[in-house]
Amino acid sequence: SVAMKHLTSFKRELGTLIDAVNKRGRKQNKRGGNEGSIMWLASLAVVIACAGAMKLSNFQGKLLMTVNNTDIADVIVIPNPSKGENRCWVRAIDVGYMCEDTITYECPKLTMGNDPEDVDCWCDNQEVYVQYGRCTRTRHSKRSRRSVSVQTHGESSLVNKKEAWLDSTKATRYLMKTENWIVRNPGYAFLAAILGWMLGSNNGQRRWYFTILLLLVAPAYSFNCLGMGNRDFIEGASGATWVDLVLEGDSCLTIMANDKPTLDVRMINIEAVQLAEVRSYCYHASVTDISTVARCPTTGEAHNEKRADSSYVCKQGFTDRGWGNGCGLFGKGSIDTCAKFSCTSKAIGRTIQPENIKYEVGIFVHGTTTSENHGNYSAQVGASQAAKFTVTPNAPSITLKLGDYGEVTLDCEPRSGLNTEAFYVMTVGSKSFLVHREWFHDLALPWTPPSSTAWRNRELLMEFEEAHATKQSVVALGSQEGGLHQALAGAIVVEYSSSVKLTSGHLKCRLKMDKLALKGTTYGMCTEKFSFAKNPADTGHGTVVIELSYSGSDGPCKIPIVSVASLNDMTPVGRLVTVNPFVATSSANSKVLVEMEPPFGDSYIVVGRGDKQINHHWHKAGSTLGKAFSTTLKGAQRLAALGDTAWDFGSIGGVFNSIGKAVHQVFGGAFRTLFGGMSWITQGLMGALLLWMGVNARDRSIALAFLATGGVLVFLATNVHADTGCAIDITRKEMRCGSGIFVHNDVEAWVDRYKYLPETPRSLAKIVHKAHKEGVCGVRSVTRLEHQMWEAVRDELNVLLKENAVDLSVVVNKPVGRYRSAPKRLSMTQEKFEMGWKAWGKSILFAPELANSTFVVDGPETKECPDEHRAWNSIEIEDFGFGITSTRVWLKIREESTDECDGAIIGTAVKGHVAVHSDLSYWIESRYNDTWKLERAVFGEVKSCTWPETHTLWGDGVEESELIIPHTIAGPKSKHNRREGYKTQNQGPWDENGIVLDFDYCPGTKVTITEDCGKRGPSVRTTTDSGKLITDWCCRSCSLPPLRFRTENGCWYGMEIRPVRHDETTLVRSQVDAFNGEMVDPFQLGLLVMFLATQEVLRKRWTARLTIPAVLGALLVLMLGGITYTDLARYVVLVAAAFAEANSGGDVLHLALIAVFKIQPAFLVMNMLSTRWTNQENVVLVLGAAFFHLASVDLQIGVHGILNAAAIAWMIVRAITFPTTSSVTMPVLALLTPGMRALYLDTYRIILLVIGICSLLQERKKTMAKKKGAVLLGLALTSTGWFSPTTIAAGLMVCNPNKKRGWPATEFLSAVGLMFAIVGGLAELDIESMSIPFMLAGLMAVSYVVSGKATDMWLERAADISWEMDAAITGSSRRLDVKLDDDGDFHLIDDPGVPWKVWVLRMSCIGLAALTPWAIVPAAFGYWLTLKTTKRGGVFWDTP
């Protein structure tokens, strides 16, 4: 019906157009137009158009017409002189413009009366061939949906130092992520180990748990290089002539032998050259020039002439033919289709020949080396102290000449770790891989040998679609590069250009030292004085490098240097690594480097003799016995931060594709809110723990609830990225990011608890090395936190660079002024540097020595490293970590080049009349007063990035010249960054420290607005260089109060404000030109762990050996943020409840659920519907409340604070009425939920109100109701905020004078509560202020003392009193029955009180007086008129 409506409307529109054309023609006739000439011209135009678009030629002996998409709109007429006109119709839907992708097929002849069948082209007089292009301008050519199945490569069997390609699909990536989690959350890892021990009840179970834990921490150990760091020391026996060495990739050996010079032998590179090409695979093909030849039944086989061309792929078949497609008989007709195959992208496989593997080795002598020549290879070669050589299987032996040191011979056995017969180097796109030979040969892709250009198995990347009567389409498959990369998971990535650098393999050499000799043994001792050019430095290998400066000129001479245990005993200890050090030149002040190995403990390095002797105290940590275990121990202590890149969940399987989407949509939001700040491993462990509890639960409903919750947690932990952002609170001037808090307090001091850390120092060191090779000499930090990050990792980077033989050191200088920008960027790389266990362990304690080349971070601009050669803004935030003392922020290299600041730490907000732009450096505050204007800005530091538009408020149509904080130093492009009378402060004092921008007068100065004032200029300080104050200032058209900058060096005015008259030479000018809500607490594992630990303590007796480590572990976890102080409070409450219920059969599981899920009180109202629930009912009700809580967070439905306060008030009243363990514990836990701290006062007020109303409802006597009702009514009036609490309180006191001796204990608490309510209404204080309880305590103490009546009372027996039965009651006076209370006062038993009308009138007078001070006098007069009788009134405090 819908289709018919569209067709009807289309027909109507068509009729309207035809009518309009007809009417226009009739008008032309009336005007005398020549219709015949018009028709002739139209026909001529059609013929010319057809001739211009359609082309005629021949194909296989028949006519071929070439058409485009404009020709198929109408009948195509082909003139034929012999047979007359041939009309053809083309109805193909894939006609495009002409290109290489063409198709040719036959248009059959259909006789009159036959409808076309299974053809999209036909003619009425003669069959012809049609040809057209299939390209379109809007999309790519049609591709096949099919893909080639490529078998997975599998894990490489090579022992390799580099990570495999897409290794994340295997278990090793899981272990690496586990290690990453352990590094970032060590407290959780420690507790997980304790849990694993405690969960096992026997040795067998404990072994299983230990196996699991070992799997979790296995990546911390690596057996490839265990016991071998990047530098090993080998000692030859006395008199030995040779020593065997084993060199690995990037390793270095130091050889020491008696009476021989010390040598360093280093493996520099393993490289394979002249790779032979084996086979090329095509993974992306294109199909062009398709042609189809068809025959009718009984007319023979169809034959396409293009079969003879080897570049074409052809396929024969049969189709149904008959009258509807140009055949006289019905049956199967032959069809032959050919298409041209061409390869667009190919993967090439190459083989490595064993004889083409080269090993580059360097040998260095520990001789007389100056600090300038240290690490300078060319200088050392010139001094015959170093040599490089290449070892190949064809030349395994080499002899090196070392000048005066003799010569050394190496006989090597090259043993590559690579079995060249089993591996190929396969290049796919820009990446190369080491692949197994069998896998390579079994690839189901078109291939060609290197000696041929013809492709085999081409049909694997082509698809012949279903054949029609005379037409068959052919399409190519899409690029298979993605499938190849996925299948290559586990293969080792290599770098290939013309050669391949191998990362596996070793070289076994025999070093012959018989011809080595010490140099300088005949020299005399140096007699002049030495001095330490630099303090001795630890190398990180247990040795010390000393740079000495010699003042004498009697060289060459030997250096008297020794290491002694005491200056009183000159017995040498330790040994010299640089054997027989000497000064080589006779020039004065020459410098020499000496390396020595001091003993463990304290020692002295003594240089020189006699009175010219100098010494340096040295301490070497460790012990002689411990040295034997240092390699393995330091390996075990290694902590490696591995990146989470390339994590791939393809191995989970397709079963989650449908279920997972639903789970993600339902629970994803709640999961991010509750668990966003946690590591995914922690989330997974929690899910596994819930699954384990579900399996062990006896009750079916509880088991199902645990299993469902645990399963959802495990799924979301592995599928939802744990991201957290920043939240901003304007009133408290605080900004939260991750799990930390950033506070900007009232004294304008920044307290930041953030610590930036690189994703992994190994990759950062490689990035620095790569940047330095590309001409980047240093880095400019964007913020002070990035600068602190470089300072923190500097030593570790330098160790990595040194251990990988890179002559480069990272130097971090103190930043000067603002943080400036630079044009270059650091680029990402997948490679990482390697570091041995020993080197890592020593890097923690000792800084490495400085290399010859430096990579400079911050500091002043120098000629060696100008800003144009530095990188900047290359790092962005990846993730937030844990911690109470600081939030760890993990960084990664930016993939794109941008000048924008990192948006992950930026918060913007508008609340009321205040707008704030804020990040970890800036707090920019604007206020609305008739118009929005900038009010103040506080700068932790000044940076040079640009504020992103995505985090900018009201940024439409802003002119940069109006921005007070310039856009180039991260000023927001916002209309909030403006103020009338001021333009952009591009020459403000932005290089100063501790800048606060606001609008006020600098102390001791005045500013006047005058036309005679000077023009804008750089900001000027209000004090001169000598400290003299400049008092008179002016501006032309600024607004007052003036713009000022307060800095550490004084007060500065804005650029519009100039000094009236002053000596220009003494002014201090700015040298800058700037133009060049609430968060829900995360679910924490800590509380759950404490419950389990307590259970184990109760189940088993813990000895001191277990208790002390457990307490220390708990303290560690508390410091690291795994347990919060609120968790401790919840834990104490729950343990108390568990002990209280231990002997009564009660259950505290529902209370534990309230504590762990932090359920808001409003969702627990259902538990209040009955005074007694069974244990199972309690658990189910709380689970329901937990689900309600999760749903409200996910749907972002906030629960109003009054509802939560009312719920807690009702819980407290219920606990007072029915004091069971559950009813008492529940309100305490509810008060500890997030956000309840701001509702304590509301809760107290509601409790008072509930008790008051209940007591009024139960009051049987009108008098008491009037007394208590008056106070409650006054309290209700004051809570609205419209009535004065002081006036109402005074009025009630006057009405009811206190005549009691003192307060009873029950009424004292009522007094405290009422004072809370009144003072809370009077003073709008912060919820964290302690002034309320302090003020109340003082007020109550004074009031109690002043208002009380004290009487000395004693008992004295005067006489015996007895009742006489004769005493009769006579008279007609009214009888008054009284009772005596605890305070000794008499009360009428039945006192009606004042009439209701008088009571209402009095309350109205008191309320009127409280409403406005002007009504106090008339209200007092009206009140006095009601005082007709005198009655004893109750005390003011007589209220619940």
UniProtKB/Swiss-Prot annotation:
InterPro entries: Env_glycoprot_M_flavivir, Env_glycoprot_M_sf_flavivir, Flav_gly_cen_dom_subdom1, Flavi_capsidC, Flavi_capsidC_sf, Flavi_E_Ig-like, Flavi_E_Stem/Anchor_dom, Flavi_E_Stem/Anchor_dom_sf
Extracellular side: 57-180, 223-674, 723-1147
Fusion peptide as annotated region, ranges: 320-333
Swiss-Prot/TrEMBL GO biological process terms: clathrin-dependent endocytosis of virus by host cell; fusion of virus membrane with host endosome membrane; proteolysis; symbiont-mediated suppression of host innate immune response; symbiont-mediated suppression of host JAK-STAT cascade via inhibition of STAT1 activity; symbiont-mediated suppression of host JAK-STAT cascade via inhibition of STAT2 activity; symbiont-mediated suppression of host type I interferon-mediated signaling pathway; virion attachment to host cell
CDD domains: Flavi_E_C, Flavi_M
GO CC list: extracellular region; host cell endoplasmic reticulum membrane; host cell nucleus; host cell perinuclear region of cytoplasm; membrane; viral capsid; viral envelope; virion membrane
Keyword Heme assigned: no
Cofactor: Mn(2+); Mg(2+)
Sugar-modified residues: 68, 376, 852, 929
Enzyme nomenclature, EC number: 3.4.21.91, 3.6.1.15, 3.6.4.13
Segments on the Cytoplasmic side according to the record's topology features: 202-207, 696-701, 1169-1178, 1222-1237, 1291-1302, 1348-1404, 1426-1440
Known role: Non-structural protein 4A: Regulates the ATPase activity of the NS3 helicase activity. NS4A allows NS3 helicase to conserve energy during unwinding.
Protein name: Genome polyprotein
